[in-house]
Curated annotation (Swiss-Prot):
<feature type="repeat" description="5">
    <location>
        <begin position="59"/>
        <end position="66"/>
    </location>
</feature>
<dbReference type="GO" id="GO:0005737">
    <property type="term" value="C:cytoplasm"/>
</dbReference>
<feature type="repeat" description="6">
    <location>
        <begin position="67"/>
        <end position="74"/>
    </location>
</feature>
<comment type="function">
    <text>Cross-linked envelope protein of keratinocytes. It is a keratinocyte protein that first appears in the cell cytosol, but ultimately becomes cross-linked to membrane proteins by transglutaminase. All that results in the formation of an insoluble envelope beneath the plasma membrane.</text>
</comment>
<feature type="repeat" description="3">
    <location>
        <begin position="43"/>
        <end position="50"/>
    </location>
</feature>
<feature type="repeat" description="8">
    <location>
        <begin position="83"/>
        <end position="90"/>
    </location>
</feature>
<feature type="repeat" description="11">
    <location>
        <begin position="107"/>
        <end position="114"/>
    </location>
</feature>
<feature type="repeat" description="1">
    <location>
        <begin position="27"/>
        <end position="34"/>
    </location>
</feature>
<feature type="repeat" description="2">
    <location>
        <begin position="35"/>
        <end position="42"/>
    </location>
</feature>
<keyword id="KW-0963">Cytoplasm</keyword>
<dbReference type="GO" id="GO:0008360">
    <property type="term" value="P:regulation of cell shape"/>
</dbReference>
<feature type="repeat" description="7">
    <location>
        <begin position="75"/>
        <end position="82"/>
    </location>
</feature>
<feature type="region of interest" description="Disordered">
    <location>
        <begin position="1"/>
        <end position="35"/>
    </location>
</feature>
<keyword id="KW-0677">Repeat</keyword>
<feature type="repeat" description="14">
    <location>
        <begin position="131"/>
        <end position="138"/>
    </location>
</feature>
<feature type="repeat" description="10">
    <location>
        <begin position="99"/>
        <end position="106"/>
    </location>
</feature>
<feature type="repeat" description="13">
    <location>
        <begin position="123"/>
        <end position="130"/>
    </location>
</feature>
Amino acid sequence: MSSHQQKQPCTAPPQLHEQQVKQPCQPPPPEPCVSQVKTPCDTKVPEPCHPKAPEPCHPKAPEPCHPKAPEPCHPKAPEPCHPKAPEPCHPKAPEPCHPKAPEPCHPKAPEPCHPKVPEPCLPKAPEPCQPIVPEPCPSTVTPILAQQKTKQK
């Protein structure tokens, strides 16, 4: 009776050929049986080994090492180092550096740069324009000079 019930739900949902549905339904049962036998074996072997080995090792090694090494080292090394090194370094380095570096840099860079760029640009533009305009002017002046010369004669 149970075999009939299994075939009905398998053939109903897929709507594929009955032969194709029957084939995949039959091979799966033996596969899970093999994996089920392997899983209990794997879990039984590692379970007792893992908890027994790491549990006693971790608490015994790190517990005594951490409190003994860092406790005496931290208070002895950082206490004398911090006040001796940073105290004399901070006031000596930043004080003379700040006024010397930014003060001369600001006036030297912007002052010469601004007047040099706009000054040569302005005279360069009108210069070529002036010689072009006066060229036709001399031609108009020549006839005037000729008239003056004729009058003098």
